[in-house]
Amino acid sequence: MADVVVLDKTPKDPAAFDKYYAETHIPLARKMPGLRKFQVSQGPVVSAAGPSGIHLIATLTFDSVAAVQSAFGSAEGKATAAGVPKFATGGADILFFDGKDV
């Protein structure tokens, strides 16, 4: 399995971020081909040292990194990515990787 982890940094307007994310971004992202699971953080995101500067963490699961690349290259993936500047005003880091159970 492969995961995509998105770290959305604190936006200029958290309420506007949350509204757009829930009403527009999630429905778009859920249409990406090959998406197996989609989770988002709930409540504050903190680090062991305290506040993190991260507003939301999203984890999307696919069968493989190739499936991730295919999904992000699809029309649905491109539409999802095109909306990011509309709400992620604090910036975002997007990481993807193959995982294994240990």
Where are these regions (language model features)?
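Macromolecular interaction modules
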Residues: 1-102
